[in-house]
Design a protein with these regions (language model features):
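A composition-driven surface/loop motif
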Residues: 79-811
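Hydrophobic h-region of N-terminal signal peptides that target proteins for export
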Residues: 10-18
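Positively charged n-region of N-terminal signal peptides that target proteins for export
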Residues: 1-6, 19
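A short beta-strand micro-motif
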Residues: 22-29, 53-57, 89-90, 716-717
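Structured surface patches comprising rigid loops and adjacent beta-strands/short helices at the edges
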Residues: 37-46, 67-76
């Protein structure tokens, strides 16, 4: 009984301690039964059965019920507020208790029930605001800077903003405990927390909790007309009719936590700049045309964590009207809705430093990154996943310039036909797309277009593409398709790893490019293509390109040996204009199994090879093809086709230097084929094998040539008359060809030329022997080679072209 009486007396005493703002603590056997700020208590009453103390707030609602028998002792926490150095406002239902030590120093406070108005001319006044009211507000008019601590404040206004800093002063808001601000839906002000001047948010480090919860029923959750700076604390916008946080100037977010789960419009909307240097921000906007973050000025992020999600149509995760820069921190953006974008800028986007960015988009016609001007990246790690049809990973109107960092992109949407000027035009799902040029000098690229992406492009420029560095792993697996443009006009669309409508320059970098869909291209340009640099190091540029998809029938033909139809053929490397190879290591394969059309290297104009280490293998068509002229001036070159020509040109051909082996299939296919056009040989070592060969044009050739008629699979050795070995070569076993053409069979023509061949000299040609030892490269032997058995013939070279019978039947 005495314990109960003692506790009751202490509880009654506690009700007079509001000015000290202590916490009341009930103990039981060394444990805390209950703790609450005294300012939260509106009353305490007692139950007789069981004998208990009931704690109510100022509105009469029960906070807790504690059995008297369980209480060992009662103490007060040391959160003491010296009443002489700050203004203390304690809201209590429809009333408020005010302690104003500066009444004679220019601070006037008026009270109308729970609505408090402050007028201050004093500089640096500290305010401490606490308590609870469902029908109260605080308006501050000050022409000088002030500091306000919110401590376990729950304030709901019945008519206006919960807190309104009505004049343009600098406000430091210190968060202590758990605070909630709610405005009235009919308020004429812009937000539950309205700040006319600058706002800085910090936390009270003596308290373990520093939360501000805001409900904006009239318009915004928080509105700041000046600069808003957040250094610490947790801000939760529980709901808002419009923007979660709205600002007319800048936002400087240096630390603390922000949560905006469902604003009525945008999450953050600032007319100035936004700088994020730390903290954690989680923003989700779900209405149509919403922006998770909207900024009229510069957006810059150096550190911290930013998580943004939007789900409405025509929405933006981050929308910047000016330059957007991310050079640190972690950014995650999730996008849904028709035509929505992850990160969008009207000017320039720059990814730098240690930035970690992940964007996932399911938006139809959406973009993970969208710039109406340029996009640059020189560092960071970016992962983009977009699955909507005709969507883009990176889309720019201006130049894409990438010099470093890591990009991983999965583009699983597909192509759609759009109507433009009464014609069907394909719109693609593309990983990186520029309406102008793409310039890449470094970085790591992992790009995948799965089978769901029909006809998509990995890296695509409407203008020129220039790549001078970087490590590229690109795979396209979706099939292309034929479509009707209008009336009876047909066309097709196919996937590409690298695609430019203008010119393309590949001077350095490592490329592993794979295209498996029908009609797929590895590298495709509508203009000229330049590979490598003059006299460059072959190790500086590594090109591994493979296609395996079959051709697409666009229009059917009328039969005949070539069919006569129109096809979209798979190509590993294709240039609509001139193609020049200066250096680099190229390994190019077309492994189609059903139809021809899969050429490894093709130019629809001229092909010039000045250098490089080139190997091209085609299973069903020419390994290398040019339309008007093919010239080899240098480099090491190997071309092989199982079913067609090794090296083919529909116009003229010139072999002026380099080392070449070119293998075609059985008759009528050839190692070197330029039909009946000029075939010029002036230098280099060249071996061409196949069922036949184009005949060199003797009037323009300056280096002697041997045309050796032999058999498929024969070993050939060519020696000077003194026994010096010029060439040891194992002819390939021919495949393909034949059919309805005359000949077929195992007959093979080997065209050979070398600077060691001289007119007026005799040479020994051995054939059908056995080669042992040495080092072999595609049938060509060097080093310590022994040749045994077989037959031989002596050849007198008295003309530019000398025909040799080495067990063959001629062509």
């Amino acid at each position: 009984m005495r314990r109960a009486a003692f506790i009751v007396a202490c509880l009654m005493l506690s009700l007079g301690l509001h000015a000290q703002e202590k916490t009341i603590i009930l103990h039981s056997q060394g444990n805390v039964l209950y703790e609450t700020p005294v300012s939260n208590l509106g009353g305490i009453y007692f139950l007789s059965s069981p004998i208990s103390a009931v704690f109510n707030n100022h509105d009469g609602a029960t906070l807790n019920t504690v059995p008297i028998s369980a209480i060992d002792s009662l103490t007060f926490g040391n959160y003491d507020i010296p009443s002489g150095d700050r203004v203390i406002i304690t809201f209590n239902g429809n009333d408020a208790e005010i302690i104003n030590p500066f009444a004679n120093e220019g601070v006037i406070i008026e009270k109308s029930q729970g609505d408090i108005t402050v007028y201050s001319t004093k500089f640096g006044v500290p305010y401490f605001v606490t308590g609870s009211s469902t029908n109260g507000s605080l308006t501050v008019n000050s022409n000088s800077a002030l500091t306000m601590t919110l401590h376990d404040l729950s304030l709901t206004s019945g008519s206006t903003a919960a807190i309104n800093f009505a004049t343009a002063c600098d406000v430091e808001l210190i968060l202590s405990g758990d605070n909630t601000l709610t405005d009235n839906a009919n308020s004429a002000l812009k937000a539950a927390l309205q700040v006319t001047g600058n706002l800085t948010v910090n936390e009270d480090t003596s308290n373990n909790e520093h939360v501000l919860r805001v409900q904006g029923n009239a318009k915004h959750g928080i509105n700041v007309d000046g600069v808003m700076t957040v250094n610490a604390g947790t801000i939760q916008i529980m709901g808002s009719d419009s923007d979660g946080v709205h600002g007319s100037s800048d936002l400087l977010w240096n630390g603390g936590t922000l949560s905006i789960p469902a604003p009525g419009s945008d999450g953050l909307d600032f007319s100035g700049n936004i700088h994020i240097a730390g903290g954690n921000l989680d923003i989700h906007a779900n209405t149509e045309s919403a922006r998770g973050i909207k900024v009229s000025g510069i957006f810059e992020m150096a550190d911290g964590t930013l998580n943004v999600g939007v789900t409405g149509n025509d929405s933006k995760g981050i929308k910047c009207d000016s330059t957007l820069i991310v050079h640190g921190g972690v950014v995650e953006v999730n996008v849904a809705g028709e035509g929505s974008n992850g990160i969008s800028s009207d000017q320039h986007i720059s990814i730098e430093g240690t930035a970690e960015i992940t964007i996932v988009s399911t938006s139809h016609d959406g973009k993970c990154f969208k710039s109406d001007n340029t996009f640059a990246m020189n560092g960071g790690n970016v992962t983009l996943t977009h699955s909507g049809d005709v969507s883009k990973g990176i889309k720019t109107v201006g130049v894409v310039d990438i010099s470093g960092g890591s990009l991983t992109i999965t583009s699983s949407g597909s192509t759609e036909l759009e109507t433009v000027n009464n014609q069907n035009v394909p719109a693609y799902c593309t990983a990186i797309k520029s309406d102008t040029d793409i310039v890449i000098s470094g970085g790591t690229f992992h790009i995948t277009l799965p089978t769901t992406n029909h006809g998509g492009k990995s890296i695509s420029a409407d203008g020129n593409m220039t790549i001078s560095g970087g490590d590229f792993t690109i795979e396209t697996h979706g099939n292309g398709a034929a479509y009707t443009v209008s009336g009876s006009t047909k066309d097709s669309y196919t996937s590409s790893c690298l695609k430019s409508d203008g010119n393309m320059v590949l001077s350095a970098g490592t490329f592993n490019l794979t295209s498996t869909g029908t009609g797929g291209k590895g590298i495709n340009t509508g203009g000229t293509m330049t590979i490598g640099t003059p006299n460059g190091n072959n190790d500086d540029l590594i090109l591994n390109v493979t296609t395996s998809g079959e051709r697409i029938t666009v229009t059917s033909g009328g039969g005949g040996p070539w069919g006569g139809g129109d096809y979209a053929n798979p190509k590993a490397i294709k240039a609509q204009g001139n193609l020049t190879i200066n250096s680099g290591t190229l390994r190019v394969n077309c492994t189609q199994t059903q139809n021809e059309g899969g050429e490894c290297i093709e130019s629809k104009a001229t092909l010039t090879i000045n250098g490089g280490d080139i190997e091209a293998y085609s299973k069903k068509d020419d390994a290398v093809n040019a339309r008007t002229n093919l010239t080899i001036n240098g480099g090491v070159y190997y071309a092989h086709s199982d079913a067609n020509d090794g090296t083919d040109c529909n116009g003229t051909m010139a072999l002026n230097g380099g080392f070449c082996i070119s293998n075609g299939a059985r008759q009528p296919e050839e190692g070197f084929d330029c039909d009946n056009n000029q075939f010029k040989i002036t230098g280099g070592t060249h071996i061409g094998t196949g069922g036949g060969t184009s005949n060199p044009t003797t009037s323009v050739c300056t280096q002697p040539i041997l045309k050796i008629n032999t058999q498929s699979g024969y070993a050939i050795q060519i020696l000077k008359s003194d026994g010096t070995v010029i060439c040891t070569y194992k002819c390939p076993t021919l495949s393909g060809g034949g059919g309805g053409w005359p000949g077929g069979g195992s007959g093979l023509v080997m065209l050979f030329t070398d600077p060691q061949l001289q007119t007026g000299q005799s040479y020994i040609v051995k054939y059908n022997g056995t080669i042992n030892g040495g080092t072999e490269w595609h049938g060509y032997y060097t080093g310590n080679v022994t040749y045994s058995g077989g037959s031989q013939t002596t050849v007198n070279v008295n003309a530019i072209v000398t025909t040799v019978n080495a067990g063959g039947s001629g062509w």
